[in-house]
């Protein structure tokens, strides 16, 4: 099967700036995820709950000693946070949605300009690639590169795969699913007797009677 590159439409606003700062001025260095699925809204509640592995209960002396005691707990929470996040991302969490008639995958690529993204299909697989050379950001110099592959559902026509880029930097790749064969209504077929067989039997009986005479 030949390789096919999928063009994507831009849904950018007129004032879009590809290299503008997407995050507040106090963004941290580890807030530079790219090429990863968008995190569900429920995760923000999960991260702040006492049930997740990265949660650290404030030290008893925190109220008495002020911010210094809270700072001691922060280094303990950060590694656990990253371990839990990596476990979730490596376990197959992804924005893949499939309805009765459509297959769709969403990917956060806000660090890449449109010309730095490539979407193509080959042998029933959608491959998304993003790459930009070293450039300066608020933390220094950085270059990024990623490749993600998704298997198309059986029966999907690769030539019908399309993609679009939203103003928020979310790449959406989708394709229509093949229509299932509709089952016909139940029909009762009557059984009929062939008249020729009956006529043939009567003629054979007459010939036997004439031969006996």
UniProtKB/Swiss-Prot annotation:
Q: What superkingdom heads the lineage? A: Eukaryota
Name where it's found. Cytoplasm; Nucleus; Cytoplasm, Cytoskeleton, Spindle
Q: Which residues, renumbered to this chain, carry the PTM Omega-N-methylarginine?
A: 12
Modified residue N6-acetyllysine is at which positions?
131
What Gene3D superfamilies is this protein classified in? 2.60.40.790
The protein's UniProt keywords, in alphabetical order, are:
Acetylation, Chaperone, Cytoplasm, Cytoskeleton, Methylation, Nucleus, Phosphoprotein, Stress response
Q: Which molecular function terms from Gene Ontology are attached?
A: identical protein binding; protein folding chaperone; protein homodimerization activity; unfolded protein binding
Q: Name one Pfam family in it.
A: HSP20
Protein name per its UniProtKB record: Heat shock protein beta-1
Species the sequence originates in: Cricetulus longicaudatus
